[in-house]
From Swiss-Prot:
Chain positions recorded as Mg(2+) binding sites: D242, E288, D315
Cofactor note (record): Binds a second Mg(2+) ion via substrate during catalysis.
Gene Ontology annotations for the cellular component aspect, listed alphabetically: cell surface; extracellular region; phosphopyruvate hydratase complex
Superkingdom of this protein's organism: Bacteria
Keyword Magnesium carried by entry: yes
The protein, known as: Enolase
Keyword Flavoprotein: no
GO molecular function, a single term: magnesium ion binding
Organism listed in the record: Enterococcus hirae
Amino acid sequence: MSIITDVYAREILDSRGNPTIEVEVYTESGAFGRGMVPSGASTGEYEAVELRDGDKARYGGKGVTKAVDNVNNIIAEAIIGYDVRDQMAIDKAMIALDGTPNKGKLGANAILGVSIAVARAAADYLEVPLYHYLGGFNTKVLPTPMMNIINGGSHADNSIDFQEFMIMPVGAPTFKEALRMGAEVFHALAAILKSRGLATSVGDEGGFAPNLGSNEEGFEVIIEAIEKAGYVPGKDVVLAMDAASSEFYDKEKGVYVLADSGEGEKTTDEMIKFYEELVSKYPIISIEDGLDENDWDGFKKLTDVLGDKVQLVGDDLFVTNTQKLSEGIEKGIANSILIKVNQIGTLTETFEAIEMAKEAGYTAVVSHRSGETEDSTISDIAVATNAGQIKTGSLSRTDRIAKYNQLLRIEDQLGEVAEYKGLKSFYNLKAA
């Protein structure tokens, strides 16, 4: 009864109006699962391959009909007949079917769509919530959210080099209260920007994209918004950032070019000094991709300098890849990994990366992409793995809010068992 009988993929649109893939899996019993695949704007050099058509006459070359065909004509034939509950075997079968190290033949987007749909169909068959199916019945930790309320870099057309300026409501007692705090700060920020004649239009992830005088001004205006909302910076709400430094690193010169803000060129050592100054001045608890993904020597220096007091998250650095993460752990580089399901391409590999991180004392931050859908699977993954942190955008745009609303439902379902750890989510820091 739990045998897969049909697999069907179609081309849909993501939150940026670009094509992506949606997959449906059906079983003998009538159980059903659907998975939608996100897409990134700033992508790591070593990410699994997102298969696009390249036909400029259609969606500017961004169509995914090849990936859709790969699901409907190749993957479907291979996995029909499998028990939908055998997630690992199905994921491994798709990896073998692709046969490349980066899923470049079938496409990570094709494979991931199936992987998510299979998990959802299995949960439907067993009549349990997805987070319980994926994580068992010890799932209880609601993640502390990183809320991206000012967008810059590749996510916005403005004068800010850093890609994301985020708040984390660590002082909240529950996820529900954390969400309220975040929303109140978001609206306070809107009022401040409007009063200064600055834009309150939003970027890809729902945050504001104002033209500020410097990168540092992003932190200053957020501190002001936290206080305006009635909270204490550093106690109730802390700051986090995603520099996405690979996006402004000049490989030929070997320097970081802060061109959007006009702050000029900086060496690796100067960037590290810059982060030290920011951390001493503002309640910043997390820095993501502070240096270029290939600047491992620089990352080692950064970790030695700030690793005890600041969460140093590897996104482009690790690309949710256990080989990359294992190398980083061995060399003492960073102390956290960003988890993006489409960087690696299956749920099995995603869970392996989270487990490896935790065993090494690294935190795992489950993350969305800038091109999202209404699919809220990452909310269930965050709870299923007791990851403790999630990054899923600002307090606007339904594609972001869908994840937060799912977490509200999960917290309600868990009832008294639910835990919101706030500052204790940073078990990788001595100060926390």
